Design a protein with these regions (language model features):
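Nucleotide/pyrophosphate-binding catalytic subdomain
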Residues: 1-245, 250
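Hydrophobic aliphatic residue packing
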Residues: 2-7, 15-16, 102, 164-166, ...
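Short, ordered loop/turn segments at secondary-structure junctions
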Residues: 18-22, 130-133, 170-171, 207-212, ...
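Charge-rich, low-complexity amphipathic helices
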Residues: 38, 96, 139-141, 217-218, ...
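Acidic/polar loop patches that form or flank catalytic/metal-binding clefts of enzymes
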Residues: 246, 257-264
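A conserved regulatory-domain signal marking ACT and ACT-like small-molecule sensing domains
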Residues: 270-460
Length: 461
């Protein structure tokens, strides 16, 4: 709360909270156990101990903490949770609409705890229920918010700093008023939505790293923290695997030109990374390298594709109707084949859908059997300055050759802001290291093999 209350004291604040650590995973596992007919009581008890333990600790630390009402809220929600789990156990499946309600319990508990903390410190606050304010459409478990329509609903929310606004993340409602969730990184997405809806001056996302790096610091030694990114650069990096941000999060803040600052809760003194329309004072053609893992590539080919209007759109319509996101697309100039990449978790379903949709063409050999290639990764080079710098593509592919990596497919957008290659997953880590070294490092690593350690060899060592 120190970070949030300090902000409120200077300029007012609104805070979006995610669930306590481990709670969402526990809720997901409870659904799985119940659907499988397993005994979920031990995990349920552990979850109960976790959240009530947080409330008990806060009660000891803060005078005036509304312990009784907080515990009553927790018990009420866990009682409803248990009823849902019993129903899932009888059904043998967790319906998506029920799962959405279950998975969001942690966020509501976080908000209740946080609101009680603020009240104990004498800070006026208001809890915003996103089910009332945030309108979304799509799957129950991965919806997309309609920011324009949602913004109109926020007309009664004070933005003058008189009240500290607190909202659960990860949650919204569909047109029927049913609770839905916003998918991976849902709380960050919720923060961007709230920032847009209340015309915030800045959206700060507090995470467990110092900001956005020019490569994954867990894989690349010497990865450098980026001080600034444009919205477009951030979108490209996040879309192709940068784990700090999700592409959905960038959309609302870019559309409404709201600066977004990525900060570290464990290191609040770190400056973080600013995402805005501003460009870094130090000009660089390339900003970063991202890696998207667990990719499967489909190749749809055959004489039926050439000159046939609408064949490509049919392929993508099949994916769209199944809510399967396509990461990368390439098409041969001969129009004989079209290739695209999706997340591997969707591969089996996608193949079945394509074979059903094109059964007649496959039967009459207008299309070849659909090729599927697993265990791939997409490595992408990103930077606004790429379009003004000649020879970057050559350096990129020379780096891949240096790493002894073959390209499965290549794609570049017309904006020339990024260039991507599809490669084997097992070679991705090596590829990223070599690319980073060639584009960002002044020091280059070489391998030296010394055979025979006589006087000269010993002196060299």
């Amino acid at each position: 709360t120190d970070i949030s209350t300090a902000t409120h004291q200077t300029d007012g604040a609104a805070v979006v909270l995610s669930a306590p650590k481990g709670v969402t995973n526990a809720l997901s596992l409870l659904c799985e156990q119940a659907a499988a007919g397993e005994d979920f009581q031990p995990l349920f008890n552990k979850l109960n101990d976790t959240v009530t333990g947080i409330a008990n600790n806060l009660n000891e630390e803060l005078d005036g903490f509304a312990h009784a009402s907080v515990v009553e809220f927790i018990n009420s929600h866990l009682s409803v949770l248990k009823q849902h789990l019993e129903g899932i156990k009888l059904l043998g499946v967790a319906p998506d609409n029920v799962a959405a309600g279950i998975l969001s319990i942690g966020e509501y508990i976080s908000v209740t705890l946080f609101s009680a903390m603020l009240s104990a410190k004498g800070i006026a606050n208001r809890v915003i229920d996103p089910v009332k304010y945030v309108l979304a459409e799509g799957d129950y478990l991965d919806s997309i918010a309609d920011v324009s329509l949602s913004k109109a609903r926020f007309s009664d929310v004070p933005t003058d700093g008189s009240e500290f606004l607190v909202m659960p993340g990860f949650v919204a409602a569909n047109e029927e008023g049913e609770k839905v969730t916003l998918g991976r990184n849902g709380s960050d997405y919720s923060a961007a939505i709230l920032a847009a809806c209340i015309d915030a001056n800045c959206c700060e996302i507090w995470t467990d790293v110092d900001g956005v790096y020019n490569a994954d610091p867990n894989q690349v030694e010497g990865a450098v923290l980026l001080d600034k990114l444009t919205y477009q650069e951030a979108m490209e990096l996040s879309y192709f695997g940068a784990k700090v941000l999700h592409p959905k999060t960038i959309g609302p803040i870019a559309q409404h030109h709201i600066p977004c600052l990525i900060r570290n809760t464990l290191n609040p003194a770190a400056p973080g990374t600013l995402i805005s329309n501003e460009k870094s004072e130090v000009w660089t053609s390339v900003k970063g390298i991202s890696q998207l893992d667990n990719v499967t590539m489909f190749n749809v080919a055959g004489p039926g594709l050439k000159g046939m209007v609408g064949m490509a759109s049919r392929v993508f319509e099949v994916m769209s109707n199944a809510n399967i996101s396509i990461s990368l697309i390439t098409q041969s100039s001969s129009e004989y084949s079209i290739s695209f990449c999706i997340q591997s978790k969707d591969a089996s379903r996608a193949l079945t859908l394509l074979e059903d949709a094109f059964a007649l063409e496959l039967q009459n050999q207008l299309l070849d059997p659909i090729e599927v290639r697993h265990d791939l990764a997409i490595v992408t080079l990103v930077g606004d300055g790429m379009r003004q710098t000649k020879g970057l593509a050559a350096r990129f592919f020379n780096s891949l050759a240096q790493a002894r990596v073959n390209n499965v497919a290549i794609a570049q957008g017309s904006s020339e802001r990024s260039i991507s290659t599809v490669i084997e997953s097992k070679r991705a880590k090596k590829a990223v290291k070599v690319i980073h070294q060639n584009f960002f490092s002044d020091r280059h690593t070489i391998d030296v093999f010394l055979v025979g350690c006589g006087n000269v060899g010993t002196e060299l060592l």
